[in-house]
Amino acid sequence: MPIAARVVSFTLPARAGAVPAAILFAPGNEASEAEADAIERSMGAGVSAGRGTIRTRRVPVGSMGALTGYQVAFVTTGLRGEQDNISAVAARSSVLTISSDPACVQAGHCVVGIATSPRVQITVSRAAARAANIRFGSAFLMLVKEI
């Protein structure tokens, strides 16, 4: 998730201090739990993102509430049926949603999609970003694919 940390560092206004991040997952869904494990391992005790430090916490999708207190939400694989609800909650709370599922971004449910194979590709949904009031620096937007 070092790529995700870079994405967060390009948000405007810049985030400073602790940047709470929810890892949304579906308990009992192997793919979702495996991705949540991988995110936790890669983030460890916290990852620097510009002047901020991303600190993650697992949140079962059924218990996400309003995502109050979170600035970022990692949307794991296996949550397609929940993406519409996640998007609505994230938009109300101005939470930056990041997923490895390209369909989440294409549908406008996630703000950022990160693919790492065959090469790194970052996609930003203008509609999801606008709905959640998420803005990025112009230098970042020149490096990514906007849809």
Describe the predicted segments one by one.
Residues 1-147:
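Short hydrophobic alpha-helices and adjacent helix-cap/hinge residues
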